[in-house]
Protein backbone atom coordinates (compact mmCIF):
# COMPACT_ATOMS: atom_id res chain seq x y z
CA UNK A 1 0.00 0.00 0.00
CA UNK A 2 1.16 3.50 -0.74
CA UNK A 3 -0.24 6.95 -1.47
CA UNK A 4 -1.31 6.03 -5.01
CA UNK A 5 -3.11 2.78 -4.09
CA UNK A 6 -4.49 2.59 -0.57
CA UNK A 7 -8.19 1.75 -0.82
CA UNK A 8 -8.44 -1.93 0.05
CA UNK A 9 -11.44 -3.71 1.51
CA UNK A 10 -10.40 -5.48 4.69
CA UNK A 11 -12.77 -8.35 3.87
CA UNK A 12 -10.89 -8.98 0.59
CA UNK A 13 -7.56 -9.08 2.42
CA UNK A 14 -9.06 -11.38 5.06
CA UNK A 15 -10.42 -13.77 2.41
CA UNK A 16 -7.05 -13.90 0.67
CA UNK A 17 -5.39 -14.78 3.98
CA UNK A 18 -8.05 -17.42 4.69
CA UNK A 19 -7.33 -18.94 1.28
CA UNK A 20 -3.68 -19.30 2.28
CA UNK A 21 -2.20 -16.23 0.64
CA UNK A 22 0.75 -14.53 2.28
CA UNK A 23 0.19 -10.84 1.60
CA UNK A 24 3.28 -8.86 0.60
CA UNK A 25 2.78 -5.11 0.38
CA UNK A 26 4.78 -2.92 -1.98
CA UNK A 27 4.77 0.56 -3.48
CA UNK A 28 4.36 1.13 -7.23
CA UNK A 29 5.66 4.63 -6.52
CA UNK A 30 9.03 3.64 -5.11
CA UNK A 31 9.75 -0.10 -5.44
CA UNK A 32 11.61 -1.27 -8.54
CA UNK A 33 11.00 -5.03 -8.09
CA UNK A 34 8.89 -7.38 -6.03
CA UNK A 35 9.81 -10.41 -4.02
CA UNK A 36 8.56 -13.73 -5.36
CA UNK A 37 4.81 -13.32 -5.85
CA UNK A 38 2.10 -15.62 -7.19
CA UNK A 39 -0.42 -12.87 -7.94
CA UNK A 40 -1.01 -9.12 -7.79
CA UNK A 41 -3.85 -7.10 -6.26
CA UNK A 42 -4.09 -3.37 -6.99
CA UNK A 43 -6.65 -1.51 -4.93
CA UNK A 44 -8.20 1.85 -5.52
CA UNK A 45 -6.62 5.18 -4.85
CA UNK A 46 -5.46 8.20 -6.75
CA UNK A 47 -3.06 7.10 -9.49
CA UNK A 48 -3.96 10.22 -11.45
CA UNK A 49 -2.40 12.36 -8.71
CA UNK A 50 0.81 10.32 -8.88
CA UNK A 51 0.72 9.57 -12.63
CA UNK A 52 4.09 11.22 -13.43
CA UNK A 53 5.90 9.19 -10.75
CA UNK A 54 4.11 5.93 -11.59
CA UNK A 55 4.89 6.41 -15.28
CA UNK A 56 8.59 7.06 -14.59
CA UNK A 57 9.04 3.86 -12.56
CA UNK A 58 10.00 1.91 -15.71
CA UNK A 59 11.73 -0.92 -13.88
CA UNK A 60 8.60 -1.84 -11.92
CA UNK A 61 6.32 -1.34 -14.94
CA UNK A 62 8.49 -3.71 -16.98
CA UNK A 63 8.71 -6.19 -14.11
CA UNK A 64 4.90 -6.30 -13.72
CA UNK A 65 4.46 -6.66 -17.49
CA UNK A 66 6.85 -9.63 -17.42
CA UNK A 67 4.82 -11.19 -14.59
CA UNK A 68 1.64 -10.76 -16.63
CA UNK A 69 3.24 -12.55 -19.59
CA UNK A 70 3.80 -15.48 -17.22
CA UNK A 71 0.02 -15.47 -16.64
CA UNK A 72 0.04 -14.78 -12.92
CA UNK A 73 -3.39 -13.61 -11.74
CA UNK A 74 -3.72 -9.82 -11.56
CA UNK A 75 -6.78 -8.25 -9.93
CA UNK A 76 -7.44 -4.52 -9.88
CA UNK A 77 -10.13 -2.21 -8.57
CA UNK A 78 -10.81 1.37 -9.64
CA UNK A 79 -7.45 3.19 -9.52
CA UNK A 80 -5.70 -0.16 -9.85
CA UNK A 81 -7.56 -0.74 -13.11
CA UNK A 82 -6.34 2.66 -14.31
CA UNK A 83 -2.79 1.50 -13.59
CA UNK A 84 -3.35 -1.60 -15.76
CA UNK A 85 -4.56 0.53 -18.69
CA UNK A 86 -2.42 1.98 -21.50
CA UNK A 87 -2.23 5.23 -19.60
CA UNK A 88 -3.94 8.04 -17.76
CA UNK A 89 -5.05 11.20 -19.54
CA UNK A 90 -5.46 14.03 -17.04
CA UNK A 91 -8.16 16.71 -17.23
CA UNK A 92 -5.55 19.15 -18.56
CA UNK A 93 -4.83 16.74 -21.43
CA UNK A 94 -1.42 15.46 -20.31
CA UNK A 95 -0.97 11.71 -20.90
CA UNK A 96 1.10 9.36 -18.74
CA UNK A 97 1.79 5.79 -19.95
CA UNK A 98 1.02 2.99 -17.49
CA UNK A 99 1.23 -0.82 -17.75
CA UNK A 100 -0.71 -1.27 -20.99
CA UNK A 101 -2.11 -4.65 -19.92
CA UNK A 102 -5.65 -3.55 -20.76
CA UNK A 103 -6.46 -2.16 -24.21
CA UNK A 104 -7.99 1.02 -22.86
CA UNK A 105 -7.07 4.52 -21.74
CA UNK A 106 -8.15 6.04 -18.43
CA UNK A 107 -9.52 9.53 -18.95
CA UNK A 108 -9.99 11.87 -16.01
CA UNK A 109 -13.00 14.21 -16.02
CA UNK A 110 -13.79 17.34 -14.03
CA UNK A 111 -17.22 16.06 -13.01
CA UNK A 112 -18.09 12.97 -11.02
CA UNK A 113 -18.74 10.10 -13.46
CA UNK A 114 -20.22 7.49 -11.12
CA UNK A 115 -21.39 7.30 -7.54
CA UNK A 116 -23.46 4.52 -6.07
CA UNK A 117 -23.89 0.81 -5.62
CA UNK A 118 -23.67 -1.74 -8.42
CA UNK A 119 -24.39 -5.42 -8.78
CA UNK A 120 -22.91 -7.67 -11.46
CA UNK A 121 -23.22 -11.35 -12.35
CA UNK A 122 -20.39 -13.39 -13.85
CA UNK A 123 -20.93 -14.65 -17.42
CA UNK A 124 -17.88 -16.92 -17.38
CA UNK A 125 -15.95 -18.93 -14.84
CA UNK A 126 -13.32 -16.74 -13.17
CA UNK A 127 -10.74 -17.04 -10.41
CA UNK A 128 -13.60 -16.09 -8.07
CA UNK A 129 -15.79 -19.03 -9.03
CA UNK A 130 -18.41 -20.35 -11.40
CA UNK A 131 -20.77 -18.66 -13.86
CA UNK A 132 -23.69 -16.83 -12.25
CA UNK A 133 -21.95 -15.49 -9.15
CA UNK A 134 -23.33 -12.14 -8.00
CA UNK A 135 -21.09 -9.42 -6.67
CA UNK A 136 -22.03 -6.14 -5.06
CA UNK A 137 -19.82 -3.11 -4.96
CA UNK A 138 -19.82 0.62 -5.23
CA UNK A 139 -18.46 3.22 -7.60
CA UNK A 140 -16.99 6.62 -6.87
CA UNK A 141 -14.96 7.91 -9.76
CA UNK A 142 -14.04 10.88 -11.88
CA UNK A 143 -12.65 8.72 -14.67
CA UNK A 144 -13.86 6.84 -17.71
CA UNK A 145 -12.21 3.88 -19.34
CA UNK A 146 -12.04 4.41 -23.10
CA UNK A 147 -11.79 0.98 -24.69
CA UNK A 148 -9.56 0.39 -27.70
CA UNK A 149 -12.01 -0.83 -30.34
CA UNK A 150 -9.24 -2.44 -32.42
CA UNK A 151 -8.50 -4.85 -29.56
CA UNK A 152 -11.80 -5.43 -27.74
CA UNK A 153 -12.01 -6.61 -24.15
CA UNK A 154 -14.36 -9.46 -23.35
CA UNK A 155 -16.20 -8.67 -20.14
CA UNK A 156 -16.77 -11.63 -17.83
CA UNK A 157 -19.71 -10.00 -16.08
CA UNK A 158 -23.03 -8.35 -16.88
CA UNK A 159 -24.73 -5.63 -14.88
Each predicted region: which residue ranges?
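A short secondary-structure junction signal
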Residues: 9-11, 87, 132, 151
Amino acid sequence: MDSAFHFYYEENLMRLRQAGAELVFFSPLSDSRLTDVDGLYFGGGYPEVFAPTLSKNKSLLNYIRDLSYKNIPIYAECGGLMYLSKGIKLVEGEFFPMLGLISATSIMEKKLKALGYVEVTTKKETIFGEVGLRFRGHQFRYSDLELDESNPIELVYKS
